[in-house]
């Protein structure tokens, strides 16, 4: 089970380049149900995702490079390329009254999308359970919680007719660029 929340951000952190960075390329063989192929640095995966916005089933199967390259031309829609920066959260904040049984190890996955999706930037945080996800208080540099907005799901981005229109957005946080 994957349980995650998604956020837009106010600005890129100043220490961005001091964090681990993964290079990701992904494409969708199907979007209902979601069947995705991904290259993450030198690793390759086939992923099935069930229905849901914050919580859903997810299964990852390793692929060889040859299998990935064979499947890539069969993908529908746009290929998504992004840099993922990993920010460990040493002491996460939670709403008043929520106390986790143990201090969780959480990580912000900051996805900086490349063309044709630039300037889109999305922060994701995965949780061990839904209760913790609901109680999580995001850091100050996060802006809007877009977890329940389907437009921010990569499978929907892959189907955008005109991803170049994202470049005309006046704001990284403005969700209007995802319309159309």
Predicted features by range, described:
Residues 1-180:
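Phosphate-end processing signature that detects enzymes handling 5′-triphosphorylated RNA
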């Amino acid at each position: 089970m994957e349980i995650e929340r998604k956020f837009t951000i106010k600005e890129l952190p100043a220490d961005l380049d001091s964090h681990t960075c993964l290079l990701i390329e992904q494409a969708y063989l199907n979007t209902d149900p979601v069947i995705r192929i991904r290259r993450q640095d030198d690793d390759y995966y086939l992923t099935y995702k069930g229905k849901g916005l914050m919580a859903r089933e997810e299964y990852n199967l390793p692929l060889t490079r040859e299998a990935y390259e064979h499947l890539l031309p069969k993908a529908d829609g746009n290929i998504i390329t992004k840099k993922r920066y990993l920010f460990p959260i040493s002491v996460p904040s939670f709403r008043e009254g929520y106390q986790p049984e143990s201090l969780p190890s959480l990580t912000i996955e900051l996805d900086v999308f490349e063309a044709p999706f630039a300037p889109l930037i999305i922060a994701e945080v995965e949780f061990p359970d839904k209760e913790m996800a609901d109680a999580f208080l995001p850091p100050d540099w996060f802006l809007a919680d877009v977890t329940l907005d389907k437009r921010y799901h990569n499978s929907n981005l892959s189907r955008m007719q005109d991803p170049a229109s994202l470049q005309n957005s006046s704001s990284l946080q403005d969700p209007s660029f995802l319309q159309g």
